[in-house]
Swiss-Prot record:
Assembly mode: Homodimer.
GO MF terms held by the record: glycerol-3-phosphate dehydrogenase (NAD+) activity; NAD binding; protein homodimerization activity
Pfam families: NAD_Gly3P_dh_C, NAD_Gly3P_dh_N
Gene3D superfamilies named among the record's database cross-references: N-(1-d-carboxylethyl)-l-norvaline Dehydrogenase, domain 2, NAD(P)-binding Rossmann-like Domain
NCBIfam families: glycerol3P_DH
Organism ancestry: Eukaryota, Metazoa, Ecdysozoa, Arthropoda, Hexapoda
EC number: 1.1.1.8
GO biological process: carbohydrate metabolic process; glycerol-3-phosphate catabolic process; glycerophospholipid metabolic process
Superkingdom of origin organism: Eukaryota
Gene designation per UniProt: Gpdh1
Places the protein is found: Cytoplasm
Positions of NAD(+) binding: 11-16, 98, 121, 155, 270, 299
Record keywords, A-Z: Cytoplasm, NAD, Oxidoreductase
Any GO CC annotation of this UniProt entry: cytosol
Name the UniProt record assigns to this protein: Glycerol-3-phosphate dehydrogenase [NAD(+)], cytoplasmic
Length: 350
């Protein structure tokens, strides 16, 4: 890497802006980093003014993180290649569906020895069905290593400076330290593990379980039932990783990316909220998305669909009754009230 490490944040939504507060402060304070951090901002007009200009003049992302000042060394750039061309570390934090297109734009335009880290929770659809990990897509397209950062990190709470933990999954030890230095803060504690695939898979699977937790809330079944759904969800997450990404360590599931993120998503988070409304309102998931999420997309139902495709292919649906039932409820093959019958005789109880 260059003498001073250049950093670019690809994305400037709610989570991207929250992480920019930490990364910007660290780049400014630590001698190994170049102070100026570029942040790719999709250009849009806010009250007749460009969003990048507003951010660079007021140091606030008024659209996605209102009321929080960004460090003055974080510079909004509307051109993706311009933002990324000098970076030694590329932080990807955009909705996962943009990744293939962004990678095409960046191919051959970035430093060949750069590294990436993905903060993106969710999968892409693999060709022919099933799931493709975002970090794998980035590595495949850009021919650079890609670590992941996942944890119980609701963006607004991170921006507020409330204490939390996060997990970095990085298969190559030599990058672990520089990544930890970049993200670690007094209120944002980082644990680095080598089990990158398990860290990333946890970040996507927990959204399925959160839908189940939301159904339980909508049915008003109480805390004991919700705890059972969360526990069985964790067991199915562990089993899924065991089947499709063998070689992972059990201890990874007890890091922030696993059990902690699962809990926070099943009590807060949009997948839970919309799933509860799905039960109480009688509206479709699509209608509720439009009404409740201000243009954001739910990750739980599409992830459940891809996971179900993989389980079906291996004849494993009956070994994952919670994942299977949640998928069937999201696609109207089952009623929400059928959820409990589906998990009453879970393989865990046999």
């Amino acid at each position: 890497m260059a003498e001073k490490v250049n950093v670019c944040i690809v994305g400037s939504g709610n989570w991207g802006s929250a992480i920019a507060k930490i990364v910007g402060a660290n780049a400014s304070a630590l001698p190994e980093f170049e102070e100026r951090v570029t942040m790719f901002v999709y250009e849009e007009m806010i009250d007749g003014k460009k969003l990048t200009e507003i951010i660079n003049e007021t140091h606030e992302n008024v659209k996605y993180l209102k009321g929080h000042k960004l460090p003055t060394n974080v510079v909004a750039v509307p051109d993706l290649v311009e933002a990324a061309k000098n970076a030694d570390i590329l932080i990807f934090v955009v909705p996962h569906q943009f990744i293939p297109n962004f990678c095409k734009q960046l191919l051959g335009k970035i430093k060949p020895n750069a590294i990436a880290i993905s903060l993106i929770k969710g999968f892409d659809k693999a060709e022919g069905g099933g799931i493709d990990l975002i970090s794998h897509i980035i590595t495949r397209h850009l021919k650079i290593p890609c670590a992941v950062l996942m944890g119980a990190n609701l963006a607004n709470e991170v921006a507020e400076g409330n204490f939390c933990e996060t997990t970095i999954g990085c298969t190559d030890k030599k990058y672990g330290k520089v990544l930890r230095d970049l993200f670690q803060a007094n209120h944002f504690r980082v644990v680095v593990v080598e089990d990158a695939d398990a860290v990333e898979v946890c970040g996507a699977l927990k959204n399925i379980v959160a839908c189940g937790a939301g159904f339980v809330d909508g049915l008003k079944l109480g805390d004991n039932t919700k705890a059972a759904v969360i526990r069985l969800g964790l067991m199915e997450m562990i089993r899924f990783v065991d089947v499709f990404y063998p070689g992972s360590k059990l201890s990874t599931f007890f890091e922030s990316c696993g059990v902690a993120d699962l809990i926070t998503t099943c009590y807060g988070g949009r997948n839970r909220r919309v799933s509860e409304a799905f039960v109480t309102s009688g509206k479709t998931i699509e209608e509720l998305e439009k009404e409740m999420l201000n243009g954001q997309k739910l990750q739980g139902p599409p992830t459940a669909e891809e996971v179900n495709y993989m389980l079906k292919n291996k004849g494993l649906e009956d070994k994952f009754p919670l994942f299977t039932a949640i998928h069937k409820i999201c696609t109207n093959q089952l009623k929400p009230k059928d959820l409990i019958d589906c998990i009453r005789n879970h393989p865990e109880h046999m």
